Curated annotation (Swiss-Prot):
Expressed in leaves. Its main location: nucleus. Residues 1049-1105 form the SANT domain. The gene is EAF1B. Residues 108-208, 261-287, 323-373, 449-469, 836-909, 928-952, 1107-1131, 1235-1266, 1296-1319, 1429-1465, 1477-1594, 1638-1703, 1767-1791, 1824-1907 are annotated as: Disordered. Residues 140-151, 1863-1872, 1882-1892 have a biased composition (Basic and acidic residues). It comes from Arabidopsis thaliana. This is Chromatin modification-related protein EAF1 B.
C-alpha cells in the first residue's frame, strides 16, 4: 500500500468510480452516482458483517479442513498480513508462515524468489507491492492479503478481505500501474519475472502464492479491471505463480483463511509446503475448501481474481461463482476472460473492479498493496478468473448468502470468484468448483484453461505448473484446465456476475475446484440457483454490496493495518522494506549470476577443451595432409623426372604418332600400365612440345599474320594448346616473337602514315622515351597501338596492322584514344585493379568536365585508364604506358575515350591478354563515363579492342564498366582520392587531379599509376591538377589551360589559352580531342569551348611560329603526328605543371574577370534572392534554423541532401566537393582556393569572405594554384552541367555575396588569387573586406582593398587565412576580422582594424589564440593556403598565411599552427565538411551571408577572431578585412571549427591565448573550457555549437565595436562556424545577446545568425535575434535597414536592452555597424577603464544579468549609448556602466548571466572603435581568444584584452559566458539546457580566469591602448 500509494489513490478513485460498474480494463469506473455512496455505506456495513461472517466461515472451513485454530488465527492475521502484504506478498508469506505455514509454502524462500515478499517474510506485503507483489501478488498477494486478513478476522475480514482483495486487486492494478510507472518500474522485471524466472520456485512458492491466492484473486480482479493488456505479464508471472497461488487456500479472496480451503488446499499446500495445510477459511469449511481451490486456482490466476472481483462484488461473485463457478470460471477463463470480461466488464467485471476499488478503499493499504503486487500477475492470468467471477452474477448475492449461510457457500463464492478470476486471467482458476450450477454457468473448472486462453503462453506455463501442483495437491487443477475452454463460452452471463466474486476471490484455488468442488459445489449450488435467478439483480446488489463491503473492508483494514497489519504495511512501504526486497532480489540475482557464471565457466571450459581438441585434430590433419602432399609431390617429381628421362629417347625414336602407338601398345598390354603409359605419354608429349616450342615460335614469327588474331595464336602455340597437352609454358621463343611482332608493327605503323607516325612520335614515342618502352611507344603511335602490347606477342604483325588500321581510324577520330589504348595495355599487368582508379583520376584530372559532362567524363575515364597504367605521372609512372599516357595516347584516349573510354577498349584490344584487365577497368569506365562522341570511336576501337580483350574476359569488362559507372558516382577515380569529388564535382576534381597528376607525377615518373594519380592530385589540387589533367590528356588540358581567358570557340585565343594549348599538346601529344577536353575543363570558368579542330588549328598556328605544324597530320591521324607539340627542354609531364605555375597570374586574371562576371550575374540572381531583400525570401525558403542545423549535422558531407534550397544544396555540395577534391589533390593553395571558392560559394554570405580568403589565399598560394583552383572551380560548374551548374549557381550566389567581395577581392591583390579561388568562392583574397562588405562592397573594397591588400597581407592575410580558413574556421577569422566591414563599414574602422591587427600582431598572444583558433581552423590566419581545400595544407598554409598576410598573424599563426597544426588538419577537415553544410545553410540565406559581409565587416574582424578564437579574431576585428572574411568563410570555418575544429580551435585557442600576456592563462583555461563546451555542443549540435560560437562571435564583434553589424553578418556565417559566430555575438553584445540568441537559430539556419545579430543593428530586425529565418531578413535588413533599425530590430529580436547597442548601431551606421561602435565605446571604456571593474562587472553582470536581464539591457543601452560617443574619444572612459550595462543588457539577449558578462566585456572592445580601435583591436584579439576559447561571444569582450590583460581575462570570462549564452540561445532551439550548463560552468570556471586576466591586463593596459 505504501509502496503503491499512487495505487492506493487509484484504488480510491476506482472505488469512487466503482459506481455500479467496474471497468475491467480501465479499473476505474466512470460512475460516481449517489447510489454508489449509498451502496458504499451499505457495503461498508455489509463488509463488516461479511468480514466477520467470512472470518467465521473461514475459521469453520479451516477447522473443518482440519486446520489448527492457531493457524486459523494466524490465517486471519496472515490474511491481514497478506492483504497488507498483498502488494509485497512478503507479509502474506510471513503471515502464512506464522499462521498458515502449512497452507503457505509462501514463507519459504521460493516465494521470496518468486516475489520479493519472500525476501522478508514477516513484513507486510503492502509495503512491498513493487517487488513481492509484482511477483507473488500476481498469484498470492491478493489472496494472501485477503486470505490472511480473513484469517485474522474470519468474519469481518472475510468480507473486508474480499473487498480489500478486490480493492487490492485494483490497488495492485493501480499500484502496478504506479509501479510500472515510477517506483515499481525498476522492480518490474523482478516482480514479474521472478516467478516466471523461477518456475521451480513457483512450485515451492506455490504455497506462498496460494496464500497469496487471495491476493492473486484480488489481483485477478484487478487484472481484469486493470486491463487485459496486463494479462501477458500477469499471465507469465501467474504461470510462475500458479502453483504457489494454488497453495494459499487460507488466503481466500473472501478473506477466509481457508479453513475449508485448507482442506482442499491442504493437498496443494501440503504438497507445496510438504505439510497438509488446509486453507484457513474463517467463513467456513466450504468456503475454505472453495478458497483452497480458488486459491490454488488463483495461485495461477490469483493475480487476476482480485482485479476481476473487486472487494465485495468479488467475494459475492466468488460465492455465486462457487455455485456456478466451474462453468462460469471456465467460460470466463477461456474466452469470456477476454470476451466476457471485456463484454461484461461494464457490468460484472466493472462492478468487480469497482468493488475491488471499493475494497481497496476499504482495505486501503493492504488492498492496494495486494493490488499493486497482484496487478501484473493477476491482470494477465487472473483476468479470466475475474471474468469467471463475474460470470456468476448471482455470486454476489450467493456470496452474501453463502457468507451469511456458511463457509461453504463462501468457499463456493470464492471458488466462483476464483473461477471468474481464472476466467479473467488465470488458467488455474478454481472454476472447477463442483457446484453444478457454477459448473453449468461457468464450467469454472475450465477456467484454468482460461489461463491458456487469456494468457495463452504464460497460462500454459501456469497450467503445467499449476496442474502439477494441483496433481500434487490432489486438486482439480487438471480438471479446471480442461474445463477452462468450455466455461467461457458457456457462461458469459456468469462472467458478468464477476461483481459477486469477492467471496470467490479466495475460492480462486482451482485445485479446490475438482477436489473441493463436490463439497463446494453443494453450497455453491445452493446459492447458485438463487444466483442464477437473481443474477442480474445480484450484479447490481453485488456492485452495491461490494462497494459497501469495500468501504467497510477499507475501514476495517485501515484499523487492522493500524493495529497490526497497517503498520506493517506502512513499514513495508518504507525505504527499508524496499531495501530488504532489493536485498532479496540481489541475493536471488547473485545466486542466479553464480549459476550463470558457473554455467558459463563450464561452457567456456567445454569450449576450450573442444577448441584444443579441434586444434589438435587440425594439426594432425595438417600433418596428414602435409604427408600426403609431400608424397604426392615426390611422386610427381619422380614421374616428371622419369618422363624427362624417357622423353629425349622418345623424341629421337618417334614422333607424336609413335608415342601414341606406344601408348596403345602399353594399353593393350596392361590396363593399369595403359593408363600410366597414357599419362606418361601425355607428359612426354608435353615436354616434347615444350622443347620444340622455339621452332614453332620461329614459324609463328615467320608468319606474323597468324599472330594478328588473339584467337589465332602462333601455329606452334595453337598446336600445343590443341594437343592433349594442357601443360605448357610460355615458349622460349615467345618473347622473340613478341619483339619481332612489335617491331614489325612499329615498322608498319611508321610506314602506315606520317600523321600516325607523328602522333606516335609526339605521344607514344615521347612517352616511350620517358618510359623507355618501345612497345608502349608503338602503342602510343595509334590509339590501338597499345593493342599490340599484349596481343603483339600472339597477334604478330598482321594483328598489329589490323589494330593499327583500326587505331588509325580511331586516332583520326580519337587521337587520344589510340594513345590511351597503348598506355593501358602496358599497364594492364602492372597496374591491374589500380589502373582503373588511376585512369579515373586521370580522366578527371585532364578534364574536370568529366564530372559534369559524361562525354568528358568518359574521356577523363579513358585518360584515367591511361593514368591508371601510368598513374598520374604518365611519363614517370609505368614506362610503357607513360609515353602514351603522357602524350598522344593518353590524350587521344582522353579525348576519344573520355566518353568511350577508348583507351580501355583500344588498349584492351591491343593489350589482348594483359589489356583485359585494363580494358575491363578502362572499358567499364568507358561504359560508365563514356558518352557521346567518344563512344562512336570507341565502338570502332571496341571492335578491335574487344576482339582481343573481350575474348579474354568480357565479364570483367562488364564488371569494370559497371564498376566505373558506379565509381564515377561514388569515387570518380578508382583511387578514391578524387572519388568523392568526381561524384560531386567530377569535372573540377578530375581535371584538377588529372592535371596535377600529369603535371606533377609525370615529372616524378616514379609514382605508380594509382599512386601517381593520387600524388599528382595531392600536389596540384587545383591548377596543377587541371594542368596535369591537361597534360595527361595532352591537348585537351592544354586547351583548357590555353583558353581560360577566352570565351567560346569563336573567341580569340588568349595568351593563356595559347600557352595552355601548347603545354597540353606538349604533355599530351596531338590528341586534339583530349586537349580540347582539357582546355575546356581548364577554361570552364570562362565558358570558353575550344573544339579539337580549333585546338589543332591554333596549335598549328602557334607551332608554325615556333616549330612547324605537325598538328595537321597529327590531327588527321588523330594521334600519329609527331608534333612539335613538345616544348624543347621540358619533360613531357612537366610542361603543364610549369605552365600552371606560370599561368597563375593569367589564370587569376581570368578567374577574376570571369568571377566578377559571375558575381554580377550571381548578384542579380542570388543576391536578389538571398542577400538583398530576397534574403528574407531566401531564408524563408530555407528551412528552419533547426533544419539547417540538422542538415549540417546529418549531412556534414552531403550538403546536397539537405533541406536547403537547391542552390544552397548545390553550393554546399560543390564547395564540399571542391574542398575535398582539392584537399585530396594535396595542393594546399589550389585546393584551398578551390574549396574556398566553392565553400564560400556555398554560403552567399560566405562567398565574400571566402572570396577574400580565396584572394588572399590564392595569392598566398602560387598563382598556378590559383589558376588551378579557378580551373577546377570553373570546371566543376562547367563540367558537370547538372551538378556543376548547381555549383555554378551556388557560386554565383556566392559570387553575389562574394561579388561585392569578389570585386574588391578581384581588385585587391588578394582578390586576384581570390578570383582564382574566388571563382568558386566568390571574391578572392579581397573577399575579406568585400565579403564583410558584401553590401558595403563599394566602401569595403576601397577600405578593404587598401586594408585587404595591406591589412589582408597583414590583417588581410589574417582575413585571407580567415578566408582560406573557410575550410579552416581560423582562416575566416583572420581574413574576416582584418578586412571585414571595419574597413568597409568604417574607413577609420578599417584603419583601426589595421591598427588592431597590428596591435593584435603586437599582441601575438591574441593573434596566436586566433591563430590557434585558426589552428582549430588551422589556417584561419593563413587559411589562404589552408583554404586551398587541403586541411593538411591548411596547417601548412597557416604559417604561410601568416607570412603572406599577417606580420602579426604569422607569429600568431605560427603558434596556433604549431599547436593547432595537427588539430587543424583534423579540425579543418571537419570544419570544411561542416563549412560545406554551413555554407549550404548560409547560402540558403545568401542575403544573410552577403548582408553579413557588409554589416559584418567591422564585426567581421571580431567574427574572424572569434572564428579563430580570440587571437586572430581580434586582429581581424581591427583590420577591416578580418570582419569580412568571417562573413563568408566564417560559416565554413566556423562550421568546420565548430564541428571538429572547435576542439582544435579551443585547444589552439588556449595555445594562442597562452601567447597573450595576461590572458594567456585565462585563454588557455577559457579555451579549454570553451573547447569542452564547444566540443560538447558540437557533438550534440554541430551547428548549435557553431551558433554558440557565432553568438559569441556576435558578442565579440559587438564588444569589438566598430563593424559590429558587419561582424554580425560574418558572425551569422560564423554562427555556423562557431568561431565567427562568436564575434557576431560580441557585436550583439549590447544587443549582441540578442544576436547571440538569434545566433542559435542562425546557427542552424544560417551561418549568419550571429552575423544577423550584428547586422541586427543593421539587420537585427530581420534577424529577429533568435530566428535564423529572421536572420536572412535581418541580413537584408542589415543592408537595407538603418543601423538604428537594425539596432531596433536586434533589440526587438533579442533584447530590449540591446536596443541601445542598436543605437550604437547608428554610430556604426557610419561603419555599417552602429551597434559595434556603441558597444565598442562602452566595451572599450570598460576595457580600458574597467579591467578590474570588468571582473567585478562580470561577476556582477553575471548576477545582475541573471536577475536583471531587462534592467541590465537598459543599462547596457544607456551605457552603450553613452559610450558610443565616448568610444572614439576615450576607450578608457567609464564605460564600466556601459560595459556593465552591456554585460547586463547582453544577458538579456543571451539570456545568460555569463553571456551578459561576455556582452559587457564585448561592449568594451566595441566601444573603442575610432580612437581606441587599435588598442581595442589588440585587446580584442586577446579577448577574442578568450571568447573563442570561452565562448564565441566572450572573445570580443576581451578583444581589448591585450592591453588590458585584466579586461581580457574578464572579457574572456564574459565572452566565454557569452559563448555559452549563444550556445544556450541557439540551443534553446536545439539543446538550450546544455548551453546554459556550459555557460554556468564557464562562468564558474572563468571567474578565476577573469581575475587572472584582470591582473594580466592591468599589468599591460598600454597594450590595450594600441595607437
Amino acid at each position: 500500500m505504501h509502496g503503491s500509494v499512487s495505487g492506493y489513490l487509484l484504488v480510491n478513485a476506482e472505488v469512487d468510480s466503482m459506481g455500479g460498474v467496474i471497468d475491467s480494463g480501465g479499473g476505474i469506473g466512470v460512475k460516481t452516482s449517489p447510489r454508489r455512496t449509498a451502496i458504499e455505506k451499505a457495503q461498508a456495513e455489509l463488509r463488516q458483517e461479511y468480514d466477520v461472517r467470512e472470518e467465521r466461515r473461514r475459521e469453520l472451513e479451516f477447522l473443518e479442513k482440519g486446520g489448527n485454530p492457531l493457524d486459523f488465527k494466524f490465517g486471519i492475521a496472515t490474511s491481514h498480513s497478506v492483504q497488507s502484504t498483498s502488494l509485497t506478498d512478503q507479509q502474506a508469506e510471513h503471515f502464512v508462515n506464522s499462521e498458515v505455514k502449512d497452507s503457505f509454502a509462501l514463507t519459504a524462500s521460493p516465494h521470496g524468489d518468486s516475489v520479493e515478499s519472500s525476501g522478508r517474510p514477516g513484513v507486510p506485503t503492502i509495503s512491498e507491492p513493487n517487488t513481492a507483489d509484482n511477483l507473488l501478488l500476481f498469484d498470492s498477494e491478493n489472496k494472501s492479503v485477503e486470505g490472511e486478513r480473513n484469517l485474522r478476522h474470519p468474519n469481518r475480514q472475510n468480507r473486508t478481505s474480499e473487498s480489500e482483495r478486490s480493492s487490492k486487486a485494483h490497488t495492485n492494478q493501480n499500484t502496478k500501474e504506479t509501479e510500472d510507472s515510477a517506483i515499481f518500474r525498476p522492480y518490474a522485471r523482478r516482480n514479474r519475472s521472478k516467478i516466471s524466472r523461477d518456475p521451480a520456485r513457483s512450485s515451492s512458492t506455490d504455497l506462498v502464492q496460494n496464500r497469496g491466492g487471495l491476493a492473486t484473486s484480488i489481483s485477478i480482479r484487478r487484472g481484469s479491471v486493470e486491463g487485459k493488456g496486463c494479462i501477458p505479464e500477469a499471465a507469465n508471472q501467474k504461470d510462475m505463480h500458479t502453483t504457489s497461488v494454488s497453495c494459499p487456500v487460507f488466503a481466500n479472496s473472501n478473506g477466509n483463511i481457508v479453513p475449508k480451503n485448507r482442506v482442499s488446499s491442504n493437498s496443494l499446500n501440503t504438497k507445496v509446503d510438504g505439510e497438509p495445510v488446509v486453507r484457513e477459511s474463517t467463513a467456513g469449511s466450504k468456503t475454505s475448501l472453495l478458497k483452497d481451490e480458488a486459491d490454488i486456482s488463483y495461485s495461477k490466476s490469483s493475480a487476476y481474481l482480485p482485479v476481476g472481483e473487486s472487494g465485495l462484488a468479488g467475494e459475492k461473485a466468488q460465492l455465486v461463482s462457487t455455485g456456478g463457478s466451474p462453468k462460469a470460471a471456465t467460460i470466463a477463463g477461456q474466452k469470456n476472460s477476454s470476451t466476457q470480461l471485456n463484454g461484461l466488464r461494464d457490468s460484472t467485471v466493472e462492478e468487480e473492479s469497482l468493488t475491488n476499488r471499493g475494497a481497496t478503499g476499504t482495505n486501503g493499504l493492504e488492498s492496494e498493496s495486494s493490488h499493486a503486487n497482484n496487478v501484473e500477475v493477476n491482470v494477465d492470468n487472473e483476468r479470466d478468473l475475474y471474468k469467471v467471477d463475474k460470470l456468476d452474477s448471482d455470486e454476489i448475492s450467493m456470496q452474501k448468502t453463502l457468507r451469511v449461510e456458511g463457509l461453504l457457500d463462501q468457499t463456493v463464492g470464492e471458488m466462483t470468484k476464483t473461477k471468474i478470476e481464472d476466467e479473467t486471467g488465470q488458467s488455474t482458476t478454481i472454476i472447477s468448483e463442483c457446484i453444478p450450477e457454477c459448473e453449468m454457468q461457468m464450467k469454472s473448472v475450465k477456467i484454468e484453461n482460461q489461463s491458456h486462453r487469456s494468457t495463452a503462453e504464460m497460462q500454459t506455463k501456469e497450467k503445467s505448473s499449476e496442474t502439477e501442483k494441483r496433481l500434487q495437491d490432489g486438486l482439480v487443477v487438471l480438471e479446471n484446465d480442461s474445463k477452462v475452454g468450455s466455461i467461457l463460452s458457456e457462461n458469459p452471463s456468469s462472467t458478468l456476475c464477476s461483481g459477486i466474486p469477492q467471496a470467490s476471490v479466495d475460492t480462486s484455488s482451482c485445485t479446490v475446484g475438482n477436489s473441493l468442488l463436490s463439497g463446494t459445489d453443494i453450497e455453491a449450488l445452493k446459492h447458485q440457483p438463487s444466483s442464477d435467478a437473481v443474477m442480474l439483480d445480484t450484479v447490481k446488489e453485488d456492485a452495491i454490496l461490494e462497494e459497501a463491503r469495500i468501504i467497510q473492508a477499507k475501514k476495517k483494514r485501515i484499523a487492522e493495518l493500524s493495529c497490526g497489519t497497517a503498520p506493517v504495511e506502512v513499514r513495508e512501504k518504507s525505504q527499508w522494506d524496499f531495501v530488504l526486497e532489493e536485498m532479496a532480489w540481489l541475493a536471488n540475482d547473485f545466486a542466479q549470476e553464480r549459476l550463470w557464471k558457473m554455467t558459463a565457466a563450464t561452457q567456456i571450459c567445454h569450449r576450450v577443451a573442444l577448441t584444443c581438441q579441434l586444434r589438435f585434430e587440425e594439426r594432425n590433419q595438417h600433418r596428414k595432409l602435409k604427408k600426403i602432399a609431400s608424397v604426392l609431390s615426390y611422386a610427381i617429381l619422380q614421374f616428371w623426372s622419369s618422363v624427362e628421362a624417357e622423353v629425349p629417347g622418345e623424341l629421337e625414336e618417334t614422333s607424336l604418332g609413335i608415342v601414341k602407338e606406344t601408348c596403345q601398345e602399353s594399353n593393350c598390354l596392361n590396363g593399369i600400365r595403359c593408363l600410366a603409359a597414357g599419362v606418361k605419354e601425355y607428359a612426354s608429349r608435353f615436354l616434347k612440345y615444350n622443347n620444340s616450342s622455339i621452332s614453332y615460335h620461329s614459324a609463328a614469327l615467320s608468319t606474323p599474320d597468324n599472330m594478328c588474331d588473339p584467337e589465332i595464336l602462333d601455329i606452334s602455340m595453337v598446336d600445343q594448346l590443341t594437343e592433349a597437352s594442357l601443360f605448357y609454358s610460355v615458349p622460349s621463343g615467345a618473347m622473340e616473337v613478341y619483339l619481332k611482332s612489335i617491331e614489325s608493327h612499329l615498322t608498319r605503323c611508321e610506314k602506315s602514315g606520317s600523321s600516325m607516325q607523328e602522333e606516335v612520335d609526339t605521344s607514344a614515342y615521347d612517352t616511350a622515351g620517358d618510359i623507355g618502352y618501345n612497345v608502349t611507344a608503338f602503342d602510343e603511335d595509334e590509339g590501338e597501338t597499345s593493342t599490340y602490347y599484349l596481343p603483339g606477342a600472339f597477334e604478330s604483325s598482321r594483328s598489329f596492322n589490323i589494330s593499327h588500321k583500326k587505331r588509325k581510324n580511331l586516332m583520326k577520330s580519337h587521337s587520344a584514344r589510340s594513345y590511351d589504348l597503348g598506355d593501358d595495355l602496358p599497364y594492364v599487368n602492372n597496374t591491374g585493379g589500380s589502373n582503373s582508379s588511376s585512369l579515373i583520376v586521370k580522366r578527371p584530372d585532364s578534364n574536370i568536365n568529366a564530372g559534369s559532362v559524361p562525354t568528358r567524363r568518359v574521356r577523363t575515364a579513358s585518360r584515367h585508364r591511361v593514368v591508371s597504367p601510368f598513374g598520374c605521372a604518365t611519363t614517370g609512372n609505368l614506362p610503357v604506358p607513360s609515353k602514351t599516357d603522357a602524350s598522344s595516347g593518353d590524350t587521344s584516349s582522353f579525348q576519344d575515350e573520355y566518353s568511350s573510354l577508348h583507351g580501355g577498349s583500344a588498349v584492351q584490344k591491343g593489350t589482348e591478354v594483359e589489356s583485359s584487365v585494363n580494358f575491363e577497368k578502362l572499358l567499364p569506365y568507358d561504359m560508365a563515363e563514356t558518352s557521346g562522341k567518344p563512344k562512336k570511336k570507341k565502338k570502332t576501337h571496341q571492335g578491335s579492342a574487344y576482339d582481343q580483350t573481350w575474348h579474354l574476359n568480357p565479364s570483367v569488362h562488364v564488371e569494370q564498366k559497371d564498376h566505373w559507372k558506379k565509381r564515377p558516382e561514388n569515387n570518380f577515380d578508382m583511387n578514391g582520392l578524387y572519388g568523392p569529388h568526381s561524384a560531386k564535382k567530377q569535372k573540377t576534381t578530375k581535371q584538377l587531379v588529372e592535371n596535377n597528376f600529369d603535371m606533377a607525377i609525370p615529372h616524378t615518373g616514379s609514382i605508380p599509376s594509382p599512386a601517381a594519380s593520387q600524388m599528382s592530385n595531392m600536389s596540384n589540387p587545383n591548377k596543377s591538377i587541371k594542368f596535369i589533367g591537361g597534360r595527361d590528356r595532352g591537348r585537351k588540358i592544354k586547351g583548357l589551360k590555353i583558353s581560360p581567358g577566352q570565351h567560346g570557340s569563336g573567341n580569340p585565343w588568349s595568351l593563356f589559352e595559347d600557352q595552355a594549348l601548347v603545354v597540353l599538346v606538349h604533355d599530351m601529344g596531338p590528341n586534339w580531342e583530349l586537349i580540347s577536353d582539357a582546355m575546356n575543363s581548364t577554361l570552364k570558368i570562362k565558358y570558353i569551348y575550344r573544339n579539337p579542330t580549333e585546338c589543332k588549328d591554333r596549335h598549328k598556328i602557334l607551332m608554325d611560329k615556333t616549330a612547324g605544324d605537325g598538328a595537321d597530320s597529327a590531327e588527321d591521324s588523330g594521334n600519329s603526328q609527331s608534333y612539335p607539340s613538345t616544348l624543347p627542354g621540358i619533360p613531357k609531364g612537366s610542361a603543364r605543371q610549369l605552365f600552371q605555375r606560370l599561368q597563375g597570374p593569367m589564370e587569376e586574371d581570368t578567374l577574376k574577370s570571369h568571377f566578377e562576371k559571375i558575381c554580377l550575374i550571381g548578384k542579380k540572381l542570388h543576391y536578389r534572392k538571398t542577400q538583398n531583400d530576397g534574403r528574407d525570401p531566401k531564408q524563408i525558403v530555407p528551412v528552419h534554423n533547426s533544419q539547417v542545423m540538422a542538415l549540417s549535422q546529418v549531412f556534414p558531407n552531403n550538403l546536397n541532401g539537405g533541406v536547403l534550397t537547391p542552390l544552397d544544396v548545390c553550393d554546399a555540395s560543390t564547395s564540399g566537393q571542391d574542398v575535398f577534391s582539392l584537399e585530396n589533390p594535396g595542393l594546399p593553395m589550389l585546393n584551398q582556393g578551390t574549396p574556398v571558392l566553392p565553400t564560400s560559394g556555398a554560403h552567399p554570405s560566405t562567398p565574400g569572405s571566402s572570396g577574400v580568403v580565396l584572394s588572399n589565399n590564392l595569392p598566398t598560394t602560387s598563382g598556378l594554384q590559383s589558376a588551378s583552383v579557378r580551373d577546377g572551380r570553373f570546371n566543376v560548374p562547367r563540367g558537370s552541367l547538372p551538378l556543376d551548374e548547381q555549383h555554378r549557381l551556388q557560386q554565383f550566389n556566392q559570387t553575389l555575396s562574394g561579388r561585392n567581395l569578389q570585386q574588391p577581392s578581384l581588385s585587391t591583390p588578394a582578390a586576384v588569387s581570390g578570383s582564382d579561388r574566388g571563382h568558386r568562392m566568390v571574391p578572392g583574397g579581397n573577399a575579406m573586406g568585400v565579403s564583410g562588405m558584401n553590401r558595403n562592397t563599394p566602401m569595403s573594397r576601397p577600405g578593404f582593398q587598401g586594408m585587404a591588400s595591406a591589412a589582408m597581407p597583414n590583417t588581410g592575410n589574417m582575413h585571407t587565412s580567415g578566408m582560406v580558413g573557410i575550410p579552416n574556421t581560423g582562416n575566416i577569422h583572420s581574413g574576416g576580422g582584418a578586412s571585414q566591414g571595419n574597413s568597409m563599414i568604417r574607413p577609420r574602422e578599417a584603419v583601426q582594424h589595421m591598427m588592431r591587427m597590428q596591435a593584435a600582431q603586437g599582441n601575438s598572444p591574441g593573434i596566436p589564440a586566433f591563430s590557434n583558433l585558426s589552428s582549430g581552423f588551422t589556417n584561419q590566419t593563413t587559411p589562404v593556403q589552408a583554404y586551398p581545400g587541403h586541411l593538411s595544407q591548411q596547417h601548412q598554409m597557416s604559417p604561410q598565411s601568416h607570412v603572406l598576410g599577417n606580420s602579426h598573424h604569422p607569429h600568431l599563426q605560427s603558434p596556433s599552427q604549431a599547436t593547432g597544426a595537427q588539430q587543424e588538419a583534423f579540425a579543418i577537415r571537419q570544419r570544411q565538411i561542416h563549412q560545406r553544410y554551413l555554407q549550404q545553410q548560409q547560402q540558403q540565406f545568401p542575403a544573410s551571408g552577403s548582408m553579413m559581409p557588409h554589416v559584418q565587416q567591422p564585426q567581421g574582424s571580431s567574427v574572424s577572431s572569434s572564428s579563430q578564437n580570440s587571437p586572430q579574431t581580434q586582429p581581424p576585428v581591427s583590420p577591416q578585412p578580418l570582419s569580412m572574411p568571417p562573413v563568408s568563410p566564417s560559416p565554413n570555418i566556423n562550421a568546420m571549427a565548430q564541428q571538429k575544429p572547435q576542439k582544435s580551435q579551443l585547444a589552439l585557442h588556449g595555445l594562442g591565448r597562452s601567447p597573450q600576456s595576461g590572458t594567456s592563462g585565462v585563454n588557455n583555461q577559457a579555451g579549454k573550457q570553451r573547447q569542452r563546451q564547444l566540443q560538447q555542443s558540437a557533438r550534440q549540435h554541430p551547428h548549435q555549437r557553431q551558433p554558440t560560437q557565432g553568438q559569441q562571435l556576435n558578442k565579440q564583434l559587438k564588444g569589438m565595436g566598430r563593424g559590429n553589424m558587419i561582424h554580425q553578418n560574418i558572425t551569422v556565417d560564423q554562427s555556423h562556424l562557431n568561431g565567427l559566430t562568436m564575434p557576431q555575438g560580441n557585436q550583439a553584445t549590447e544587443k549582441g545577446e540578442i544576436a547571440v540568441s538569434v545566433r542559435p537559430d542562425q546557427q542552424s539556419s544560417v551561418g549568419t545568425t550571429t552575423s544577423t545579430d550584428l547586422q541586427s543593428k543593421p539587420f537585427v530586425s530581420p534577424l529577429s535575434s533568435n530566428h535564423s529565418q529572421q536572420l536572412p531578413k535581418s541580413f537584408p535588413g542589415a543592408l537595407s535597414p538603418s543601423p538604428q533599425q537594425q539596432m531596433q530590430l536586434h533589440s526587438d529580436n533579442s533584447i530590449q536592452g540591446q536596443s541601445s547597442p542598436a543605437t550604437p548601431c547608428n554610430i556604426l551606421s557610419t561603419s555599417s555597424l552602429s551597434i559595434a561602435p556603441a558597444v565598442a565605446p562602452s566595451n572599450h571604456q570598460h576595457l580600458l577603464i574597467h579591467q578590474k571593474q570588468r571582473n567585478q562587472v562580470q561577476s556582477t553582470a553575471q548576477r545582475v544579468v541573471q536577475h536583471n536581464h531587462l534592467g541590465n539591457s537598459e543599462l547596457s543601452k544607456k551605457s552603450q549609448a553613452e559610450c558610443m560617443p565616448r568610444v572614439p574619444q576615450s576607450v578608457t572612459n567609464t564605460t564600466q556602466t556601459a560595459s556593465m550595462g552591456t554585460t547586463k543588457g547582453m544577458p538579456q539577449a543571451s539570456n545568460d548571466l555569463k553571456n551578459i558578462k561576455a556582452v559587457g566585456s564585448t561592449a568594451v572592445p566595441a566601444l573603442e572603435p575610432p580612437s581606441c580601435v587599435a588598442s581595442v583591436q589588440s585587446t580584442a584579439s586577446k579577448v577574442v581568444n578568450n571568447s573563442n576559447t570561452d565562448s564565441a561571444g566572450n572573445d570580443p569582450v576581451s578583444t581589448p584584452n591585450q592591453g588590458l590583460a585584466q579586461k581580457h581575462g574578464i572579457k574572456g570570462v564574459t565572452q566565454r559566458q557569452q559563448q555559452s549564452l549563444p550556445s544556450e540561445e541557439k540551443r534553446p532551439k536545439l539543446p538550450e539546457k546544455p548551453t546554459v550548463q556550459n555557460q554556468k560552468h564557464l562562468a564558474s570556471e572563468e571567474q578565476p580566469h577573469l581575475e587572472e586576466a584582470q591582473e594580466l591586463s592591468s599589468s599591460k593596459p598600454p597594450d590595450t591602448k594600441v595607437e
